[in-house]
């Protein structure tokens, strides 16, 4: 196998792995709406606000940070990285409201048209764009 064919094959494998990670991340981040609704209803959560706020605690954040050197070459990486960090601020704020018993305010912050909904949608769109570009 020539070097160029081998390199192309290696690149395809890497792209397939990135696609899998993106798919997992979209699913995992989608679960946060469920977790937040649960926290609002119960006024408790297994997650601490500061843990939720920190982007490198979740699987996507761990992957984005651990593979940064190899992922920087992708134009969509920086956008996803930045949006991901911003997205973590909103669930932390909502979690804080939920744990403080501010159910109506927390529910509103989670609803359609909220910062959480908009940032989540932008992050998902950016990840899908990245996946399609591979």
Feature map (PLM): residue ranges:
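N-terminal membrane-sensor/transducer module of prokaryotic signaling receptors
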Residues: 1-134
């Amino acid at each position: 196998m020539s070097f160029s064919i081998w390199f192309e094959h290696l690149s395809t494998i890497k792209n397939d792995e990135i696609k899998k990670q993106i798919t997992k991340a979209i699913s995992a981040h989608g679960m946060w709406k469920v977790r937040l609704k649960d926290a609002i209803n119960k006024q408790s959560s297994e997650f601490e606000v500061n843990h939720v706020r920190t982007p490198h605690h979740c699987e996507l954040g761990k992957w984005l940070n651990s593979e940064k050197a190899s992922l920087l070459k992708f134009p969509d990486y920086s956008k996803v990285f930045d949006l991901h960090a911003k997205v973590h601020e909103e669930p932390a704020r909502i979690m804080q409201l939920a744990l403080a018993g501010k159910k109506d305010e927390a529910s509103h912050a989670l609803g359609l048209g909220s910062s959480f909904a908009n940032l989540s949608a932008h992050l998902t769109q950016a990840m899908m764009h990245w996946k399609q570009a591979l």
